[in-house]
């Protein structure tokens, strides 16, 4: 993550006007204040807990890039709508492989309140494995495929981690606890979830450099 900060583009005048998921994503994808595109708060399927509706007329970054000849992909978490016209493939992404909803109740089953929100484009899927590792693997495969076909492409990779639940692979928790046995279990799990995420980002970066 530090390497991305040091070598990438720093948006040092970017404000999402919110500390939560949906508005931040709306701001990132449109370059506008989230409330101006209908997302002042978290988008949820239940009316009494919903705080937004992504304006279908808002122009998104992948739409602009797509018009410029880029292939566009979202791998990972969407959280800007559950139904048409606010599905990833309808908002500028040629390829979607990931999670539609707000959070996972389990990083291995990928369920949210009993529902399955894992999709490959418009098809529900039920992959096996930790979500962070799945998103990494799918991203690596996507980069290699587009590079092989010599397509200019844009990949928006959005992990669920380190969002709760604090569910890193056990071996990563063990590493943290071996370094500092005084850590509370919850703290150790959070550190492990972040380190596991960082490790997986580190698997994507070399592939992108190699194939650009």
Can you name each region flagged by the protein language model?
Residues 1-212:
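Formylglycine-dependent sulfatase
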């Amino acid at each position: 993550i530090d390497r991305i900060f040091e070598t990438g583009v720093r948006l040092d005048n970017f404000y999402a006007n919110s500390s939560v998921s949906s508005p931040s994503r709306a701001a990132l994808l449109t370059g506008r204040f989230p409330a101006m595109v209908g997302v002042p708060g978290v988008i949820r399927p239940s009316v009494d807990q919903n705080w937004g509706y992504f304006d279908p007329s808002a122009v998104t970054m992948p739409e602009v890039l797509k018009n410029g000849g880029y292939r566009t992909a979202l791998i990972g978490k969407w959280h800007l709508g559950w139904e048409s016209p606010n599905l990833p493939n309808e908002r500028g992404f040629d390829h979607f492989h990931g999670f539609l909803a707000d959070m996972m109740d389990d990083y291995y089953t990928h369920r949210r309140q009993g529902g399955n929100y894992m999709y490959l484009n418009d098809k529900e899927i039920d992959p096996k494995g930790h979500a962070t590792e799945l998103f990494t693997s799918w991203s690596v495969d996507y980069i290699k495929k587009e590079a092989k076909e010599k397509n200019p492409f844009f990949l928006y990779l959005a992990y669920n981690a380190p969002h709760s639940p604090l569910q890193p692979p056990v071996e990563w928790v063990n590493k943290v606890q071996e370094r500092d046995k005084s850590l509370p279990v919850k703290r150790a799990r959070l550190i492990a979830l972040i380190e596991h995420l960082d490790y997986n980002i580190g698997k994507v970066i070399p592939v992108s450099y190699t194939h650009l």
